[in-house]
UniProtKB/Swiss-Prot annotation:
Higher taxonomy: Bacteria, Bacillati, Bacillota, Bacilli, Lactobacillales
Species of the source: Lactococcus lactis subsp. cremoris (strain MG1363)
Gene Ontology biological-process entries: D-galacturonate catabolic process; D-glucuronate catabolic process
One annotated GO molecular function: glucuronate isomerase activity
InterPro entries, A to Z: Metal_Hydrolase (IPR032466), Uronate_isomerase (IPR003766)
PANTHER family: URONATE ISOMERASE
Pfam families assigned: UxaC (PF02614)
Source superkingdom: Bacteria
Listed EC numbers: 5.3.1.12
Name of protein: Uronate isomerase
């Protein structure tokens, strides 16, 4: 089969039919990403391919380092064209890596350039792409609109004033840019900046934080504020997690120790985190939000690189907490007793957790359709094989037609072809089930499932259009 042909990843006739007749046409809701709302509002113009392709993309940075490229041409102050040449040189060696497919798919879909990036074509591609980047069609809003994206959910700190979201809500009519609340600084209470952060949270919420209860009250105010601007999700990263009973625990004392940068015992930290997550579950439930939990990830594990370059620069790895499902089971059992389990999507960076998490989810489903879900293959699992494995586990342990599907988790405005990539994998997976006689060869039945997973489910699950739908 030709590279990136119309039928790439579609290995049977059923898959081809499902993709071209059902998946391909569906709009996109990107419910988890790391795009900057300021860049969307200001409609930033990118000067060249390096700025839009390599800026902030730690997936690509890892490959560049593996190819011996100096940091000056990765995150440093090197010339943009030299950075692009280094990437082109590296990409030639990335055969079999999804970045090779993604990059060429982006080149083909956005720039309509159907050439392989290589030392022979790099200058031609650079010039041709940069000429197009100078046009308004390659500003962020046009890229979003022309990708048929209806909703973008950014990732935002609770103290954010969401000024760009406010402005976009007034001015942008073709798509929604909605905030998703991610309180990392309430989880990372041992980083030495906790007291300073609580002062920020207090100021923006208008609530004096003097203890754990008032901290949660301030957080609730931020949930209300985010909700007023269309917020429907919270997101939480737990590198590791150990459940701890919180009954009769002096949480105020733990909070005070953290504010004073005193060393917390492991038990104290686990008690605080458990209490915090339970309160966050309660708030998600109250506001009819969805809680996302990202677990089993080791972040910024290269100390010198962290100090020199900073976080989110490509020095993270898969976590190996073997009992994470056991600890989460205790958390959800406690939440069930308190009747505070919200809609939840669980992601683990370690594939070994997926089957355990899928069976855990089945024990705590509440009222409503698929309230708890196993999230899409995340980060290092955002590959054809990773996507297929997640689909297989979801289908075998729950109801695949209820799955809310793909998200980019990206910092790039050119990442939307990843939805196409996922839909191709989905159609091929389902097509194989048809071809092997495991599900009916019924286009109406199966085609609807493909359309639902691609768009309809996420539209209904999160309620982004609840007000508009109620008026119809």
């Amino acid at each position: 089969m030709k590279f990136l042909s119309e039928d790439f990843l579609l290995n049977n006739e059923s898959a081809k039919l499902l993709f071209h007749e059902h998946a391909e046409k569906m709009p996109i809701i990107d419910y988890h990403c790391h795009l900057e709302p300021a860049e969307i509002y200001e409609n930033k113009k990118y000067e060249n391919l390096t700025q839009i392709w390599l800026g902030g993309d730690h997936y690509k940075w890892r490959l560049l380092r593996a190819n011996g490229i100096p940091e000056k041409l990765i995150t440093g102050d090197g010339d943009d064209y030299e950075k692009f040449l280094a990437f082109a040189k590296t990409l030639e060696k990335s055969l079999g890596n999804p970045i090779y497919e993604w990059t060429h798919l982006e080149l083909k879909r956005f720039f309509h350039i159907d050439k392989l990036i290589s030392s022979e074509t790099e200058k031609e591609i650079w010039d041709e792409a940069n000429q197009m980047l100078a046009t308004d069609d390659f500003r962020p809003r046009a890229l979003i609109k022309n990708s048929n994206v209806k909703v973008v959910c950014t990732t935002d700190d609770p103290v954010s004033k969401l000024s760009y979201h406010k402005s976009l809500a007034k001015e942008e009519k073709d798509f929604k840019v909605l905030p998703a609340l991610r309180p990392d600084h309430l989880i990372s209470i041992t980083d030495g900046h906790f007291a300073e952060y609580l002062m920020e949270l207090s100021a923006v919420s208008g609530i004096k934080i003097k203890d754990f209860k008032t901290m949660i009250k301030a957080l609730e105010q931020r949930f209300e504020f985010f909700t007023s601007l269309g917020g429907r999700l919270s997101d939480h990263s737990l590198s590791t997690y150990t459940f701890a009973e919180t009954k009769n625990v002096d949480l105020d004392s733990i909070l005070q120790k953290a504010k004073e940068n005193q060393t917390l015992t492991d038990l104290e930290y686990n008690q605080y985190i458990t209490a915090l997550i339970l309160e966050i579950m309660k708030l998600n439930k109250k506001f009819d939000w969805t809680m996302q939990l990202h677990v089993n990830v080791n972040r910024s594990i290269n100390g010198p690189a962290l100090r020199k370059i900073g976080e989110n620069t490509g020095f993270d790895s898969m976590g190996t907490q073997a009992n994470i499902s056991e600890e989460l089971t205790k958390l959800f059992s406690k939440a069930a007793e308190l009747e505070i389990i919200p809609k939840t999507i669980l992601y683990s960076l370690n594939q070994n957790d997926w089957l355990e998490l899928a069976t855990l989810i089945g024990c705590f489903q509440g009222e409503g359709v698929q309230q708890l879900q196993l999230g899409a293959g995340w980060w290092f699992n955002d590959t054809a094989k990773g996507m297929e494995k997640q689909l297989e586990i979801f289908a075998s342990q729950s109801l695949l037609p209820n799955f809310v599907g793909m998200l980019t988790d990206s910092r790039s405005f050119l990442s939307y072809p990843r939805h196409e990539y996922f839909r191709r994998v989905l159609c091929n997976f389902v097509g194989q089930l048809i071809e092997s006689g495991r599900i009916p060869d019924d286009e109406a039945l199966v085609g609807k499932m493909i359309e639902d997973i691609s768009y309809n489910n996420v539209h209904d699950y999160f309620g982004f259009f609840k007000n508009e739908d109620s008026k119809q």
